[in-house]
A protein has these predicted regions:
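Acidic/histidine-enriched, glycine/proline-rich intrinsically disordered or flexible terminal extensions
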Residues: 158-170
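Left-handed beta-helix
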Residues: 7-8, 13-14, 19-20, 25-26, ...
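Conserved catalytic-core motifs of eukaryotic protein kinase domains, centered on the activation segment
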Residues: 88-90, 116, 150-152
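Short, structured secondary-structure boundary patches
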Residues: 107, 154, 168-170
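Glycine-rich adenosyl-nucleotide cofactor-binding module
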Residues: 3
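Conserved beta-strand-loop-alpha-helix hinge in the C-terminal portion
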Residues: 136-160
Length: 170
């Protein structure tokens, strides 16, 4: 490992690679042959499986489960209590982990099912169950998750909300 770990109760498997300036909080398990990119933050009580790749500058918040073999791009945000699953037909011996592309945002309590790709800069709303691929630069939510708007529409709404909140605080 290239940097000292932070927190207590951290368990790492064999051949784990943790990049520079990575912060790992309390009670995190990181499986064998997993790679964590530079600048990533991993919150407490996360379970990261074997053969996982996490890109640079990701924020994985508390109580997140990332199953064996998942691939997470750079600058990905995963909110608390989310799960990335890899077993499409339990108890299968063939794992089909999801892929989360660069810049994606996964809200709290989201479940991403196996064999799914969440596209670049896609946003998944809290509590969603992602059962199929999510196109890049879209916002999806629900159970099952469905595309509800483009990233541009979302950013415009968010910008308006932030501006309105600033006026209220004055």
């Amino acid at each position: 490992m290239l940097n000292p770990k932070r927190g207590i109760g951290i368990v790492t498997g064999a051949n784990v690679e943790i990049g520079a300036n990575v912060v790992v909080w309390n009670y995190v398990v990181i499986g064998d042959n997993t790679k964590i990119g530079d600048g990533t933050v991993i919150g407490s009580f996360c379970d990261i499986g074997k053969n996982v790749v996490v890109g640079k500058n990701c924020n994985i918040q508390t109580h997140v489960t990332i199953s064996n073999g998942c691939v997470i791009g750079n600058n990905v945000f995963i909110a608390p209590n989310s799960s990335l699953l890899n077993d499409k037909y339990p108890k299968s011996t063939i794992m089909t982990p999801p892929v989360i592309k660069d810049g994606a945002v996964i809200g709290g309590g989201v479940t991403v099912l196996p064999d799914v790709t969440v596209g670049e800069k896609a946003v998944i709303g809290s509590g969603s169950v992602v059962t199929k691929n999510v196109p890049p630069r879209t916002v999806s939510y629900g159970a099952p998750a469905a595309v509800v708007m483009s990233l541009e529409e979302y950013e415009a709404k968010r910008s308006g909300f932030v501006e309105a909140r600033r006026k209220v605080k004055k």
